[in-house]
A protein has these predicted regions:
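Short hydrophobic/aromatic beta-strand immediately N-terminal to the Walker A/P-loop
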Residues: 5-7
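A glycine- and Lys/Arg-enriched "phosphate-lid" helix/loop adjacent to the NTP-binding pocket
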Residues: 52-55, 105, 110-156
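NTP-dependent small-molecule kinase module
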Residues: 127, 149-191
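P-loop (Walker A) phosphate-binding loop of NTP-binding proteins
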Residues: 11
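Post-Walker A helix-loop "phosphate-sensing" segment adjacent to the P-loop in P-loop NTPases
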Residues: 24-33
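Conserved nucleotide-sensing/catalytic segment adjacent to the nucleotide-binding pocket
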Residues: 33, 42-90
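Hydrophobic positions on the alpha1 helix immediately C-terminal to the Walker A/P-loop
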Residues: 19
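Conserved lysine of the Walker
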Residues: 16
Length: 191
């Protein structure tokens, strides 16, 4: 069976994770595998916490793209991979990994573009980072203004032109979600 790869891109807080999770809920983990792009941040064990806090995590160079590409190839070849786990509280990869099994469909959170209003995205990011990642409001706002917003304008927003599908509001857009689900169903039936 040929594997279908679905890439999901969009700005911070746009709904990429929600959309990916809803695809998995629709089919189950035996049919759909997810590689979460954030887990592929490079390790920086050589730096102290304060230095890691100052890194620009929104530039493409922040990611271990070679490892991500290797894992995609392995999954497409039917092999399982151990996806790294990024720990937001220490601004570094943890020693843990998550086993990701090969499946007919691989969702890569990084040619679907999730387009959500900038005000909604920043509010979602603030809520998520403060509640789930233990960040302070000041640190989230400072990071947004110094790296997130400029990198979004330089790298994320231009990638929208390359998308096959642009989904307003991410996983909350039921019509778009159903369209993706139907595409995946068709792929699974043809296999």
């Amino acid at each position: 069976m040929e594997t279908i790869l679905i890439g999901i891109a969009g700005g911070t807080g746009s709904g990429k994770t929600t959309l990916a999770d809803k695809l998995v809920e629709s089919f189950g983990s035996n049919e759909v595998s997810i590689l979460r792009h954030d887990n592929y941040y490079k390790r920086h064990d050589e730096m102290c916490y304060e230095e890691r806090c100052k890194l620009n995590y929104d530039h493409p160079d922040a990611f271990d793209t070679d490892l991500l590409c290797e894992h995609i190839r392995m999954l497409k070849d039917g092999k399982s991979v151990n996806m790294p786990v990024y720990d937001y509280t220490i601004h570094n990869r943890s020693d843990e990994t998550i086993a990701v099994n090969a499946a007919p469909v691989i969702v890569l959170e990084i040619k679907v573009f999730v387009d959500t209003d900038a005000d909604v995205r920043i509010l979602r990011r603030i809520i998520r980072d403060v509640k789930e990642r233990g960040r302070s409001l000041d640190s989230v706002v400072s990071q947004y203004l110094t790296t997130v917003k400029p990198m979004h304008e330089q790298f994320v927003e231009p990638s929208k032109r390359m998308a096959d599908i642009i989904i307003p509001e991410g996983g909350e857009n039921i019509v778009a979600l159903e369209m993706l689900i139907e595409r995946v169903k068709k792929h699974l039936q043809e296999a």
